[in-house]
C-alpha cells in the first residue's frame, strides 16, 4: 500500500536485496490495500478485506523491483487478527495463492522460492556466518 508507513520503501527494498535479504510479504489487509480508512479502528461490520490477488500484486511488484531471489511470504497469521485476505485465512488456503501465482506465470521453482526457499537460503547463510565468525 503506497504511503502505509509500515511498508518498506523502494529504496529500503533495494538496499535489502543488495545485502542478499528477503522481503516477507505480510497478509494484513492494511499492508496490501488502502480500501479501509486507516485512521479508524477495525470494525468487523464495515471492514473490507483484501483478496488473494492483492497479495500476488505485492509479490509481483517486489519481484519486478528486486528479483525473485528477494521475495517471500511472512503471513503474520498470529499478528493481524481478522484482517487477513479473503482466501488466505490460514495455511490450509495457501493453494489459493499458489494457483494465483501460477496463473501469473510463476514457475514451480519461483513459487518454491517465495514460499520458503529464499528465507531458507538466507537462514543458511546466517548460520554459516555465525559458525565462521
Regions found by a protein language model. Give the residues of each.
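Outer-membrane beta-barrel pore domains
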Residues: 35, 43-52, 81-88, 101-113
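A conserved active-site cap/scaffold subdomain adjacent to cofactor or substrate pockets
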Residues: 20-28
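Glycine-rich tight-turn/loop motif centered on a GG-T
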Residues: 1-9, 40-49
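Short acidic/histidine-rich active-site segments
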Residues: 26-27, 66-88
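Histidine/acidic residue-rich metal-binding segments in metalloenzymes
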Residues: 5-21, 53-69
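Mid-to-C-terminal alpha-helical segments outside catalytic/metal-binding sites
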Residues: 89-133
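Conserved, mostly hydrophobic/aromatic
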Residues: 23, 76, 111
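Flexible loop/turn segments at secondary-structure boundaries
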Residues: 1, 30-34, 79-82, 120-122
